[in-house]
Amino acid sequence: MNIPCKTVWLKGYVDEGIPGPEHFDIRSSSVSLEDLPDGAIVVQAHSLSVDPYLRGRIKRKNPLNQKSAKGGTDVAIDTDTGETIMAGFVAGQVIASRNSAWAVDDFIGGAMDFSTVQILAPARLNATIVWKLTGYVDASNISLGIGALGMPGATAYGGLCDVLRPKKSAAVGGEATQSPETLFVSSAAGAVGSLVGQIAKSVYGSVVIGSCGGPVKNERIVAEYGFDHAIDYTTLSGEDGGKAELDERLKAVAPNGIDMYFEAVGGIHFEAAMTALRPHGRIAVCGVISKYNDAELSFNKIDIGSMIYSFQRIEGFVASPWLRRQRGDFLRDMSQWIQEKKVIPDETFFEGIEQWPLAFQSLFVRGNASKSGKVVVRIARPSLDEKKETKSE
């Protein structure tokens, strides 16, 4: 039996500027369910992730373009033009299996091709990151598997709980003398930042300050996510790119400085956080979205000397240790917080695989009020009867 398949392809490298639909193709093919190798599974995608980190993958100078960006899988990459299958995080369901660890109808999340249907052979399963979502989601909320229960959730969980390590305030069960620590979150209305702020507030009792673009998002992070303060970066101005004004606004809501900064942006946000960082302050770095569209990456300079006697710490990290359950129990904790309404995932949906390029472009549009939380491309799934009617050629 053959199942029709659609796949997102990158036409060629996009070294600078905002990528758009003109840079991608949606190509049709089919996947055969016959003669599956031992250990293989077939995954039908329900949701495709749309993430800022993929911007780096489509640049010529990204070293991942010289080999597979998916953990050792075989992907045809034209290193001269950059033409390749796009890949990232996918949530779906197992529709055929010759692997004892995976049953038909299991829900799965993982790093895969952006295809509606695909075979994961044993070598691919062993090389990539996959996690079982069965028991945590159902067909109605499987998109959480690429959001709060996927890479963004693991990034928020790992960066906050294990890297920044907030001290629980007395108000949420911490030591009686522990006052709330202050956290500054960049890209606060995004997939990761929105979760970071909610966890910090509801689980640790922190004072949470968020920066995001536009009045709609700034109102949302306070009214819906529970942030204490919001800073609209789109209103910053000045010859220094708004750095002095950001310093002033941050000081107005955190006159005694900040204890923690969750970094996803870079640029003036990082500089303002360093200026406001208190002794024993911590910074967790998961991304620098302000630089992703530049042809050449450039990063902030750090005054290392000032950090020594202030006992400050900066740590970069990625989500994989928590997705692989090498650190903590991310799925258990996050799913519990969702059930307890301590975390309310926010999602923005685009319908159909054809919309993936437009959804990706939306990540980089300054002050885009229509986008908040996790951006997800939902894929219409054929019914079981439709699959049965699909004949082998």
What is each stretch, according to the model?
Residues M1-S30, D35, R381-E393:
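Eukaryotic N-terminal low-complexity, Ser/Thr- and Lys/Arg-rich leader segments
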Residues D78, T84-Q93, A101-S187:
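NAD(P)H dinucleotide-binding glycine-rich loop of Rossmann-like/cofactor-binding domains
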Residues Y204, I221-V222, I268-V343, I379-E393:
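Glycine-rich phosphate-binding loop and adjacent beta-alpha segment
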Residues V8, V42, I108-G109, F184, ...:
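Hydrophobic beta-strand signal
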Residues N2-P4, K342-F349, P357-E393:
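C-terminal capping/lid region of NAD(P)-dependent oxidoreductase domains
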Residues K167-S169, G173-Q178, E224-Y225, H229-I314:
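Glycine-rich cofactor phosphate-binding loops and adjacent beta1-alpha1 units
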Residues I146-D240:
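Mid-domain Rossmann-like dinucleotide-binding core that forms the NAD(H)/NADP(H) cofactor-binding site
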Residues S32-V50, R57-F114:
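Glycine-rich beta-strand-centered segment in the early N-terminal region that forms part
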